[in-house]
């Protein structure tokens, strides 16, 4: 059996556009050359050929030249409200299989308010919120301070700092204005949940009939068939409590190698069971595929009730730094094994036979 030709599609930071109007954190969610090289080598270690292709306007020509059997997609995109969906749209036009979620899911989940509307409709717990298109929009009567304010369509904690927690109208308007000026997009304000922040990573695909709403039957299975859940992770923010009371962009980017990642997070079995169930539910209602990471806040004032913040169907895969990589490592799964788990999951979904596999 011949080796598969796998194209790693990514947006490298060193290849990103550069001009004066860009904010200083514009490309924080793009991948480093180190990460890209690590994923290429991981795919090769699974017995397949792999080549990195930049996910920009050169992609179509390079795909025609390389003729991949499947693409391993981690492209974040450069511009546009649906930038994470742009490369998958090209791949679907060219009828090339790829890992991860499809166009609609990637466009949806980049838009945090739209995702929260979907979660709310499905009766999944997410903090009450309001979207601000103007700085002078009145605050809804049902929202109370403190609120948490962030850009509607950014990742990697961009636009998030200790000042994102606003306690009055003046602070709210100040943060909204900053987001408008810096990111040129609507601001999302949601009820601030005082408590702990944890994240759950998962690989796989749902099998069989799955409820779209929370089941009322307590005897139904709590863990969805077909998904592999990694141990939940929590970041210890105690050493940074004077400067960063939340998991900010500064911590995620500038200080990532100095953080204490607690994984598995100290949670009881019932809480982990609930988090996994909610993660599976979000995975289902957003149409995610192959891999995702779901972020939660646990409400200290309400018996640590979980609230869903967002789902990331394109979680970072930087060795030793990205959340889902750390979660997998806590289970004894090394970086190259995780990468091949994701690839193998997509290959099974497409019915593509692989050359080799790794025992996990």
Predicted regions located by residue number:
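ATP-binding N-terminal substructure of ATP-dependent carboxylate-amine bond-forming enzymes
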Residues: 1-98, 104, 109-110, 133-139, ...
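A short beta-strand motif that forms the metal-chelation/ATP-contact edge
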Residues: 6, 70-72, 199-204, 304-319
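Active-site nucleotide/adenylate-binding loops and adjacent lid/helix of ATP-dependent enzymes
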Residues: 1-10, 64-67, 107-196, 204-209
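Hydrophobic beta-strand scaffold residues
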Residues: 50, 97-98, 126, 147, ...
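Phosphate-binding site of ATP-dependent enzymes
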Residues: 169-277, 303-307
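Short acidic/His/Gly/Ser-rich catalytic and metal-binding motifs that mark active-site loops
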Residues: 15-19, 155-158, 242, 255-256, ...
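A short glycine-rich, hydrophobically flanked beta-strand micro-motif that places a catalytic Asp/Glu
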Residues: 55-56, 187-191, 198, 287-301
């Amino acid at each position: 059996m011949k080796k598969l030709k796998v194209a790693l599609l990514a947006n490298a930071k060193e290849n990103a556009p550069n001009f004066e109007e860009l904010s200083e954190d514009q490309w924080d969610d793009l991948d480093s050359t180190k990460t890209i090289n690590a994923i290429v080598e991981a795919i090769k270690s699974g017995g397949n050929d792999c080549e990195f292709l930049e996910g920009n306007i050169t992609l179509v020509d390079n795909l025609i030249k390389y003729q991949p059997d499947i693409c391993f997609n981690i492209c974040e995109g450069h511009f546009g409200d649906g930038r994470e969906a742009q490369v998958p749209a090209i791949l679907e036009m060219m009828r090339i299989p790829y890992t991860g979620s499809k166009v609609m899911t990637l466009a949806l989940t980049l838009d945090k308010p739209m995702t929260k509307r979907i979660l709310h409709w499905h009766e999944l717990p997410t903090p009450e919120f309001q979207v601000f298109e103007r700085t002078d929009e009145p605050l809804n009567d049902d929202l109370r301070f403190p609120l948490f304010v962030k850009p509607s369509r950014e990742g990697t904690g961009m636009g998030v700092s200790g000042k994102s927690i606003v306690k009055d109208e003046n602070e709210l308007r100040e943060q909204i204005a900053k987001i408008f000026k810096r990111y040129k997009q609507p601001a999302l304000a949601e009820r601030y949940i005082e408590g702990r922040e944890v994240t759950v990573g998962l690989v796989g695909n749902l099998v069989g009939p799955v409820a779209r709403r929370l089941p009322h039957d307590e005897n139904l299975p709590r863990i969805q068939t077909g998904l592999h859940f990694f141990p939940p992770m929590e970041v210890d923010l105690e050493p940074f409590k004077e400067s960063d009371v939340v998991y900010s962009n500064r911590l995620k980017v500038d200080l990532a190698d100095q953080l204490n990642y607690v994984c598995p997070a100290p949670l009881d079995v019932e809480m982990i069971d609930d988090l996994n169930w909610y993660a599976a539910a979000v995975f289902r209602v957003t149409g995610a595929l192959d891999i995702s990471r779901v972020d939660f806040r646990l409400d200290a004032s309400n018996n640590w009730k979980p609230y869903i913040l967002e789902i990331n169907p394109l979680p970072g895969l930087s060795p030793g730094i990205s959340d889902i990589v750390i979660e997998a490592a806590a289970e004894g799964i090394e970086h190259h094994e995780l990468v091949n788990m994701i690839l193998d999951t997509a290959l099974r979904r497409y019915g593509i036979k692989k050359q080799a596999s790794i025992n996990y």
